[in-house]
């Protein structure tokens, strides 16, 4: 992806959930003698970064898919949760 495509994807994603913060972890910082920041992906709606990939896939494909298309996901974990959430966001049928 080009930098402009990354910026476009980030902007589109803000309609689904806010930017996840970087948070200084004082315990780990003290332990390792360096500032250690945690990227708080647990603050996304499905508690995982996997929603990002599902969102970008659907953002690209939904408009080109025939009406009534059912999407299928073979996962039982974080990706499945992101897939289901994004299906609902885009108003498409999904099967996990």
Where do the model's predicted regions map?
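PLP-dependent amino-acid enzyme catalytic core
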Residues: 1-96
């Amino acid at each position: 992806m080009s930098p402009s495509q990354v910026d476009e994807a980030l902007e589109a994603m803000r309609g689904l959930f806010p930017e996840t913060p970087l948070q200084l972890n004082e315990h780990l910082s003290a332990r390792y003698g360096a500032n250690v920041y945690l990227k708080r992906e647990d603050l996304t709606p499905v508690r995982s970064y996997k929603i990002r990939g599902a969102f970008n896939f659907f953002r690209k494909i939904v408009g080109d898919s025939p009406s009534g298309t059912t999407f299928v996901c073979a996962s039982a974990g974080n990706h499945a949760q992101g897939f289901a959430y994004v299906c609902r966001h885009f108003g498409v049928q999904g099967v996990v």
